[in-house]
Amino acid sequence: MAPLRGWAARGHRLTAKVPHGRWKTMTFLAALRHDRIDAPWFIEGPIDGESFRTYVEKVLLPTLRPGDIVVLDNLGSHRGKAVRHLIRSAGAKLFFLPKYSPDLNPIEQVFAKLKHLIRKAAARTVDAVCAAIGKALPAFTPEECANYLANSGYRS
């Protein structure tokens, strides 16, 4: 990923190296709590039902506590019966967002900041992107996480 903007001295053209050609699809999944980013997971490739079920089973489920609420958008891989069963078996509740409502999904604000930080790091390879994500996650303070939830209309 490359920065979207830059600056140069007046009268001089801005030059920067940016990737072009074929790119690889990378997926980052995480949970947002009122005080931290939880259950981060990075995979090479797009998300599908099987990989999302693996994420829920191996990464998210161990962090869930009874009474937690899992907010999901309407991506097809989120609606699988196995996923719903796994989340409910941990004592957590499921809440599916209405279609086309990213403003109600607080993790979207996290992803926007995360993308900005990755672009700023100018990570060009899969390993560099993964390392940039690892360095960026501590930048999310407890106050900021609580603000993302409040901004989307959730109270904790």
Predicted feature locations:
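Short functional hotspots at interaction and active-site rims
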Residues: 1-156
